[in-house]
A protein has these predicted regions:
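Short acidic capping loops at alpha-helix termini that bridge into adjacent secondary structure
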Residues: 70-74, 95-96, 142, 178, ...
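Conserved PLP-binding active-site segment of the aspartate aminotransferase-like
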Residues: 221, 288-294, 306-345
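Active-site phosphate-binding strand-loop segment of PLP-dependent enzymes
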Residues: 126-182
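PLP-dependent aminotransferase-like
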Residues: 89-148
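PLP-dependent aminotransferase class I/II
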Residues: 32-33, 198-273, 277-280
Length: 346
């Protein structure tokens, strides 16, 4: 066994979501798609979708048309985290990885698995912003990959292409993880992959498309990068049923667009209603909030109503340990548990 693996600790989440009435802890879509469309999809399924290995050619072409890229710019994977894993396998050989801290935890996991030094750059203590200039100070000759979630999780901030250009100018592969970009009014960097040969973008069907259970992710980059990343692909990247559902969502993208718009409007509404709370807004489909008692009463109310959320410490410099991260869903502000939160804690 590789000696460094002894230091890697993984956590398995076996939370039984059926015990909760509201699932708002992992940025998933908990609002069902319209029943008529779901029924239409179910009727489209055939036994062959389960019995045979999938042919992804047409699906890949549909993705490329949707994102206005060429097939040689796309790598399809079993979730975007497998795309990220394949990027580690392609570019890292025990060098160092530079990213923001906190961020998506799998960056650190993959750094450990591939025996890379993980350099997590903290947000500024005073401004609570991530300084790209400061981040660059940790990039050296041993840096093999720079990663930036954009918008970031859990902070929810966004960097423009001009802001990250100094990272791209290093010539080191730069991975921009755009898992939440659809909930932002900011631009995606996919259109820049022809301008920057070291730019890599990952996207997912899990968040805005509401298909987390399908495990379908995409990586976009220049043909040379994609050719080499694809050497680490699984024999069959995704299941036939997952492919068919995601293809259905692309064909009926107005369902996705409505959900995104409804989430963004609900997020604005909730920020107004929770003006008396400590709030960390985001460019994603969630917010963090805290109260004078570090969310002690919040937890009592949400537990009573069987609401599953996530509690965490966001900033390494913050004194409060128990920020509540809640996924924004259309109509969230009309739920009884939310009204009770406002009445009890405002």
């Amino acid at each position: 066994m590789k000696p460094h693996l002894h230091k890697v600790k993984r956590i398995f989440d076996y939370t039984d979501k059926s015990e909760y009435d509201f699932i708002l802890n992992q940025s998933e879509r908990s609002q069902p798609i319209p029943q008529s469309y779901y029924t239409k999809f179910l009727r489209s399924l055939k036994q062959e979708d389960f019995a045979y290995y999938p042919n992804t050619k047409n699906f890949k072409e549909k993705i490329c048309n949707f994102y206005n890229v060429k097939p040689e710019n796309l790598f399809l994977s079993d979730g975007s985290d497998i795309g990220i894993k394949s990027i580690f396998e392609t570019f890292t050989t025990c060098g160092n990885i530079v990213t923001s801290e906190p961020s998506f935890p799998m960056y650190k996991v993959y750094s450990s698995l591939y025996n890379c030094q993980y350099k997590g750059i903290h947000y500024d203590k005073d401004t609570r912003q991530l300084s790209i200039e400061h981040m660059l100070k940790f990039v050296d000759d041993e840096t093999q990959l720079i990663i930036l979630a954009n918008p970031n999780s859990p902070i929810g901030d966004y960097k423009t292409i001009d802001e990250i250009k100094p990272l791209l100018d290093t010539g080191i592969p730069v991975l921009i993880d755009e898992a939440y970009i659809e909930f932002s009014d900011k631009e995606s960097f996919i259109k820049y992959i022809d301008d920057y040969p070291n730019l890599i973008i990952t996207r997912t069907f899990s968040k805005a498309f509401g298909a987390a259970g399908c495990r379908v992710g995409m990586t976009f980059s220049n043909p040379h990068y994609i050719e080499n990343i694809s050497k680490f692909r699984q024999m069959y990247e995704i299941s036939g049923v997952s492919m068919k559902y995601c293809e259905f969502l692309l064909d009926n993208h107005h369902i996705v667009e409505k959900y995104i718009n409804d989430v963004v409007e609900e997020r604005k509404k909730i920020l107004t209603l929770m003006k008396d709370f400590s709030i960390l807004n985001s460019e994603a489909n969630w917010i963090h909030f805290n109260t004078h008692d570090d969310n002690l009463k919040t937890k009592q109310i949400l537990d009573k109503h069987k609401v599953l959320v996530k509690y965490c410490k966001i900033h390494p410099y913050g004194k409060r340990e128990n920020w509540c991260r809640i996924t924004i869903q259309p109509g969230l502000s009309e739920q009884e548990f939310f009204k009770e939160l406002l009445n009890e804690l405002s």
